[in-house]
Amino acid sequence: MGKKQVRPPRALPPVPSAIQDDIPLSRPKKKKPRTKTPLASASSEGLVQTAVHRPPEGSEPPTKDSIEHQEAPVQRRQKKTRLPLELETTLTQKKTASPSLLPNENGINVEPDEEPVIQKPRRKTKKTQPAELHYANELGVEDEDIITDEQSSPEQQSVFTAPTGISQPVGKVFVEKSRRFQAADRAELIKTTEKIDVSMDMKPSWTTRDVALSVHRAFRMIGVFSHGFLAGCAVWNIVVIYVLAGDELSDLSNLLQQYKTLAYPFQSLLYLLLALSTVSAFDRIDFAKTSVAIRNFLALDPRALASFLYFTALVLSLSQQMTSDRIHLYTPSSVNGSLWAEGIEEQVLQPWIVVNLVVAVLVGLSWLFLSYRPGMDLSEELMFSSDVEEYPDKGIKVSS
């Protein structure tokens, strides 16, 4: 009774495997390999427990309380293995903060020396929740971002609404002249622009096609006039010849004396009118299609007949040009150096009179043929009309 009862030393609870992984006992530099089988880890835990928790000799066997303390950590270890890694680390820190008391030789409970605890470096895992909260805060709606209709309505009216007042024109305007802007009166500027517009309307632009078409139509009008004038001149010429020659060409010397002054002028005029009339008649025929022109002539087309008769009259008139020269140079046979000998007047003049008669008849018939349809011109339709098609049947086939 007088002696204080000495309590037996308390055995340390077994350290769980998860805690041993994080906190080494005596060798801080030694790291436990991660790739271990469950059997090897269990055997190592058993050896550590026997080495650490062996009671000293001469001590009493462990009591019921100590046994309960030894069994309790086992159950806790089984539960802790199911917990996540963060909770295990917090539990180990709590246990290390409150170590159990160890009895010394005198039987007094003494706190064990704190062993250096070296924690294993842990990998930092990315925390997704703070990031989500950060983005959620950024996407939050603030009061400044909310715009009411009352605030936006005056701004929209000031920017987009048109002025209600009527704009008044300014008296002076600035016009760029020689790379400089000069002030000018609006009324004078409007007058000058109106004059320019009127002049542009009065002078339409002409193309080469328009000029060619106008020239062609003007020449056709001249040709129509030459046809009638040539027919009249030819008839007048033959009438004058027969009047001056007398009955049955009995007075040819009188014809030579009276007609020699008219031979050159009249023959020149007749030749000019025949040339114009022949070209004008040919313009009315489509010579681009030779077969069509020959077919029209054989079918007695008035335009084809007129062109042929004019060409024949022109050739006959040129064939009698030498006789006209001799008539112009007529002198009596009694005069020295005369081109007309005695008795040859009838031999020279008779063919000339017949040719002039034929020319008058041909010219008159041609004028009658062309006067039937004076506006008909196939050359104009071919050259200047875009609606004329060379092969209408083929065009229909291609379009189909």
Swiss-Prot record:
UniProt key word Nucleotide-binding: no
InterPro entries linked to this entry: TMEM237
Top-level taxon: Eukaryota
Region (Disordered): 1-112
Encoding gene per record: TMEM237
Organism the protein comes from: Bos taurus (Bovine)
Description of how the protein assembles with itself and partners: Part of the tectonic-like complex (also named B9 complex). Interacts with TMEM107.
General function of this protein: Component of the transition zone in primary cilia. Required for ciliogenesis.
Family note: Belongs to the TMEM237 family.
Subcellular location(s) of the protein: Membrane; Cell projection, Cilium
Regions crossing the membrane: 221-241, 262-282, 297-317, 352-372
Keywords recorded for this protein, A-Z: Cell projection, Cilium, Cilium biogenesis/degradation, Membrane, Phosphoprotein, Transmembrane, Transmembrane helix
GO biological process: cilium assembly; regulation of Wnt signaling pathway
Low complexity compositional bias, start-end: 84-96
Pfam families listed in its UniProt record: TMEM237 (PF15383)
Bias kind Polar residues: ranges: 97-107
Comp. bias intervals (Basic and acidic residues): 54-71
Modified residues (Phosphoserine): S17, S43
CC per GO annotation: ciliary transition zone; membrane
Protein known as: Transmembrane protein 237
Membrane topology: Multi-pass membrane protein
